Amino acid sequence: EQCNVDDFLMITYTRAAAAELRGKIAAELSARVARQPEDDHLRRQLLRVYRADIKTVDAFCGSLLRENTHLLRPVDGRSLTPDFRVLDEQEGQVLRSRVLERVVEDFYQKIQDGDQRARLLADTLGAGRDDRRLTELVLELYDKLQSHPYPLRWLAEQRRQWEHLPEHLADTPYGRIMMDRTLSAAAFWEEKLRSAAGEMEQYPKVQKAYQGPFLAVAEALSAYPAAAARGFDAMGEVNPAFPRLGAVRNAEDEAFKERMKALKDRCAKAVKAQQAVYAVGEEAYLEDLREMGPAILALMELTASFTAAYQQEKVRRNCADFSDQEHYAIEILTTPDGTPTGLARQVAGRYREIMVDEYQDTNEVQNCIFSAISRQEQNLFTVGDVYSYSVFQAPRNHHYRHHKDYGYGKT
């Protein structure tokens, strides 16, 4: 097709990678022009490649913001201007510390005014004698918030859940995470064990001693989904412990036998770790959550206060950090319900294709941006390594949806 190179948005994750990619495209175009000097279209691409959008997420968001700061919602009566400055890491840390110091002073004033949640949080962390743990937790939670497309909305949702704890642990985020990890691990090891049992058919001696135990544990692991439907305590009743493996003398392939033993040991260790989670019953976990609830709510309120104060101070100084640029981009590209704005549709119209490298390293914030500026993800092409995630990580299924008719490339 007679495409122009600047009809594409190409996202990489370092400036060096962006420069390298631009250089490779320019070199390839030069080589083709040398072979086809009469091709005017190719010659035009040599000029266009230097204005093509080949950049990092930060650079893309920064350019978008400088063109559209007028669309940002004011913060305490102020807004960023197009000449806003991006804070470097050290500046950001210094400014965060100053703002947090003021916010913590207000927190102690709340305690003096009789705020019981604030007092419980302070007592739990030993605050007053040493504020370091309190400030560390606020900054840790703040940093985690930045991985969400709508941080304060997400925090408000968590606060509502802590204010009204469900009757069952499976209905809490904490319980769901534990159970989902177990289900993911069980599915992973069940597949591994069944596959290994199939391989054993080539080695009758190993098969006779090992296949039965492997299949027995695989079958036990398959019981986890049904147990999860019954609740948290039912998960603890599943017992996928390995029976003792039989002895194998003069195995057909000693290396294969040792590989099977090593697989068994890894599986047994992983299963044991999961079973330990359920050694404490559901009611004990729920009681802990009820006791921690007021302190957790106070921590969330303190973090929300810090987030707002820090944002106000940055806007007052007409500056932003890297995560701000991404969140501001979401603000002007999506409505509160996540629908693309007019600006998003306008940006989407610029590009035939949006290509994202190292997609496994994207977070929900960046994924939201890519989704907003694509045509319902039909022109979004992503390349990433599906195997970069641990089996125990939370599911990231949105990374593995197929866009258009492409399969995912391999890194």
Annotate each language-model stretch with its function.
Residues 7, 132-320:
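Conserved ATP-driven helicase/translocase motor core recognized via long
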Residues 52-63, 122-147, 299-305, 320-333:
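Core structural elements
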Residues 336-353, 373-376:
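Short basic/glycine-enriched coil/helix segment immediately N-terminal to the Walker B
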Residues 46-53, 72-150, 258-267, 271-278, ...:
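ATP-hydrolysis module of ASCE/P-loop NTPase motor domains
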Residues 9, 51, 352-353, 379-380:
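The start of beta-strands in P-loop NTPase/AAA+ ATPase cores
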Residues 1-73, 313, 317-323, 328-331, ...:
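P-loop NTPase Walker
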Residues 27, 31, 262-276, 282, ...:
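Conserved RecA-like helicase ATPase core segment
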